[in-house]
UniProtKB/Swiss-Prot annotation:
Quaternary structure, from the entry: Component of the ATP synthase complex composed at least of ATP5F1A/subunit alpha, ATP5F1B/subunit beta, ATP5MC1/subunit c (homooctomer), MT-ATP6/subunit a, MT-ATP8/subunit 8, ATP5ME/subunit e, ATP5MF/subunit f, ATP5MG/subunit g, ATP5MK/subunit k, ATP5MJ/subunit j, ATP5F1C/subunit gamma, ATP5F1D/subunit delta, ATP5F1E/subunit epsilon, ATP5PF/subunit F6, ATP5PB/subunit b, ATP5PD/subunit d, ATP5PO/subunit OSCP.
Location of this chain's protein in the cell: Mitochondrion inner membrane
GO cellular component, one term: mitochondrial inner membrane
Keyword presence, Transmembrane helix: yes
Family designation: Belongs to the ATPase A chain family.
Transmembrane segments: 14-34, 69-89, 98-118, 132-152, 179-199, 202-222
Catalytic activity: H(+)(in) = H(+)(out)
Molecular-function annotations in GO: proton channel activity; proton-transporting ATP synthase activity, rotational mechanism
Record's bilayer topology term: Multi-pass membrane protein
Highest taxon above the source species: Eukaryota
Protein name from the UniProt record: ATP synthase F(0) complex subunit a
Amino acid sequence: MAMSFFDQFASPSYLGIPLIAIAIALPWVLFPLPSLRWVNNRLITIQGWLINRFTNQLMLPLNTGGHKWALLLASLMVFLITINMLGLLPYTFTPTTQLSLNMGLAIPLWLATVIIGLRNQPTVALGDLLPEGTPLPLIPVLIIIETISLFIRPLALGVRLTANLTAGHLLIQLIATAVFVLLPMMPTVAILTATVLFLLTLLEVAVAMIQAYVFVLLLSLYLQENV
């Protein structure tokens, strides 16, 4: 039976047991543990420098109250980057191509930012639903539109991450299939196609990191509006 291109996004199972939990937990095993030595090795030093740079850029527009989220957002970005990068390896499963996982990350974090705004600044949070200077007849319509746009935010977060990764994986598989089909018939064309595949893989590595950064950056912008 011919396999579908979308079979790579199905959650693998062994003896009927879904392995998505192991796929999600595995990246944490790859993280280097802090060293007890006075001078850390190069890997930990580079990792710490990158996380500090990212945290400083992310927390720059936030006030002191938003700095409490620095560890959570930095950990989330590293986690997403690791999962996305591991998903580019052959014969691996990418959990972030599942909308259920991405929505499970987006909805609680978005809801937490909204609750913080309603608890700390209820007047300002509710005032964002109605722009200043709105004509009286348009007030009900604008409130409905702003409320809908507010609730669409977590959906946009999850769908953006899922769609970008899914499209990239499908394109890589299509071009890789073309390489195997063309290799015995037209080797020259197959080599050119393989070059395109290599360049596309490099692009997907960049997309995997950029999408994780965009996911966390949008969360920080939502947090900025509510702290």
